[in-house]
Amino acid sequence: SIGTGIGGALTVGGQLYHGAHGTAGELAHLLVPVSGAIGCGCGRTDHLEAVASGPAMAAEYAARAGVPTQPLQAVVALMHSGDPIARAVVADAGTLLGRVLAGVATAFDPEVIVIGGGAAQIGADLLSPLTSAFRVEAMGPIAETAILPARLGTDAPLVGAALLAAATRIEITP
């Protein structure tokens, strides 16, 4: 999920895989192949969320264009109107996402990678460079892993959380 942050989940045999510490699929704080120290909200640098989330793309546009930071939706509108800086920022974020996902796929060999969240709604301008970078970076047959947009769009994380709650029968007591 690409939005205000970066999130992920792994399923194995149709079941959500939590991992030994409950953090399986946490992609936000994977290191990214960038030059420079880009600060992350966690206090460290060069994490995926710091360079490819919606706020990161908006901040990068502001830095490159020399303008105040504006919402990602404004950057996307500029991209659609042909702004070369906006197009480059989105493409660069897609490329970094694709490279990191190639590493994740090399480790876990998934059948499919589903991309959702608000920033994923940018569409082909983000997903095309993501897919291209993934195909170049991934090894062997992993490079052919299907990369699909989430069918539920921006609702995917909410539906996933609700399904998790239902599956684990979380009870709320007053």
Predicted regions and their residues:
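Glycine-rich phosphate-binding loop of actin/hexokinase-like ATP-binding domains
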Residues: 1-51
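ATP-binding/phosphotransfer module of carbohydrate and carboxylate kinases, centering on a glycine-rich
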Residues: 11, 34-40, 44-174
